[in-house]
From Swiss-Prot, chain A:
Protein name: Phosphoribosylformylglycinamidine synthase subunit PurQ
UniProt xrefs under PANTHER family: PHOSPHORIBOSYLFORMYLGLYCINAMIDINE SYNTHASE SUBUNIT PURQ
Gene name of the record: purQ
Assembly and oligomerization: Part of the FGAM synthase complex composed of 1 PurL, 1 PurQ and 2 PurS subunits.
Catalytic activity of the protein: N(2)-formyl-N(1)-(5-phospho-beta-D-ribosyl)glycinamide + L-glutamine + ATP + H2O = 2-formamido-N(1)-(5-O-phospho-beta-D-ribosyl)acetamidine + L-glutamate + ADP + phosphate + H(+); L-glutamine + H2O = L-glutamate + NH4(+)
Function statement: Part of the phosphoribosylformylglycinamidine synthase complex involved in the purines biosynthetic pathway. Catalyzes the ATP-dependent conversion of formylglycinamide ribonucleotide (FGAR) and glutamine to yield formylglycinamidine ribonucleotide (FGAM) and glutamate. The FGAM synthase complex is composed of three subunits. PurQ produces an ammonia molecule by converting glutamine to glutamate. PurL transfers the ammonia molecule to FGAR to form FGAM in an ATP-dependent manner.
Source superkingdom: Bacteria
UniProt keyword list: ATP-binding, Cytoplasm, Glutamine amidotransferase, Hydrolase, Ligase, Nucleotide-binding, Purine biosynthesis
Pfam family of the protein (one): GATase_5
Length: 233, 79
């Protein structure tokens, strides 16, 4: 899997992401500076990592979404290329129009930084094939604006088309207000675009990929992408 | 020429910051506050004539200053 990690000023999770990609795919990802106008030849996966691009000024991800490299990412996505956005990366994908909706301030206003449980809603997508449908995984979150919001029609479409891939839940997989850490509509933690090749999620799977991290539940996401690309090749 | 773009959340969009400020004002004993919505103000200086300035400000708001999924904006040329 030939991956590219986007690097914007202020981003601080790009090396965690690169480490996870290297570990699971066995290949060194390319680091792509925001001012670039193209992606490396043969890129299979583009990742917008977490961090605080441009200091979260204006709205989270708003400035990064207008960076030169994003035109290349949009073209890559419209050709069917796989794009993953984590945390600030999710915010960037929403702001850039690659995903619908927006991430608002957490409903209870606090910055949240701890492990959460996620229910994997289906396993027949490139982003979830490393898991079983209904499986509960544990991954960390670290965000102040992760409260997913969209108009009613969009939410209805996301649900109806099975585009919610990850949802906040309890350790045993129950979804409800008490487990919805940031107030997101329908407890949404991660969604895909209509075509199914662009995923945005608030939690950080790249931070649960090695035993030393205390948990390896995040590995399945990357392993699934590798398996998907190997099968396609 | 000076101009101002005001960005506010659309009606019906939950505004947790506004709610927190509303609660703080109530606890400070400021009377008569029914509700608070928080927004943003951009003070911008431009060159050129007023028609061009208005078009530029609208483009700025549409392209970057506001996210029209959840926000409305108002453009004023202050002269």
């Amino acid at each position: 899997m030939k991956s590219a990690v986007l690097v914007f000023p202020g981003i601080n999770r790009e090396r965690d992401m690169a480490r996870a990609l290297r570990l699971v795919s066995g290949r060194e990802p390319a680091m792509v500076w925001h001012a670039e106008t193209s992606l490396p030849e043969g890129t299979d996966l583009v990742v917008a990592p977490g961090g605080f691009s441009y200091g979260d000024y204006l709205r989270c991800g708003a400035i990064a979404a207008r960076a030169p490299v994003m035109d290349a990412v949009r073209a890559f996505a419209s050709d069917g290329g796989l794009v993953l956005g984590v945390c600030n990366g999710f915010q960037i994908l929403c702001e850039s129009g690659l995903l619908p909706g927006i991430l608002m301030r957490n409903a209870r206003l606090k910055f949240i930084c701890h492990d959460v449980h996620l229910r994997v809603e289906r396993s027949d997508t490139p982003f979830t094939r490393g898991y079983n449908a209904g499986q509960v995984i544990r991954v960390p979150v670290a965000h102040g604006e992760g409260n997913y919001a969209a108009d009613e029609d969009t939410i209805r479409r996301l649900e109806g088309e099975g585009r919610v891939l990850y949802r906040y839940c309890s350790a045993s997989g129950e979804v409800g207000d008490t487990h919805n850490i940031n107030g997101a509509a329908q407890s949404i933690a991660g969604i895909v675009n209509e075509r199914g090749n662009v995923l945005g999620m608030m939690p950080h799977p790249e931070n649960h990929v090695e035993d030393i991290m205390g948990c390896t539940d995040g590995r399945g996401l990357f392993a699934g992408l590798v398996a998907h690309l190997e099968r396609a090749a | 020429m000076k101009a101002r773009v005001t960005v506010t959340l659309k009606a019906g969009v939950l505004d947790p910051q506004g709610k927190a400020i509303e609660g703080a004002l109530k606890s400070l004993g400021v009377d008569g506050i029914a509700s608070v919505r928080q927004g943003k103000v951009f003070d911008i200086e431009l060159d050129g004539d007023k028609t061009k300035a208005e078009a530029a400000l609208k483009a700025a708001a549409d392209k970057l200053l506001a996210n029209t999924v959840i926000e409305n904006y108002r453009v004023e040329v202050l002269g």
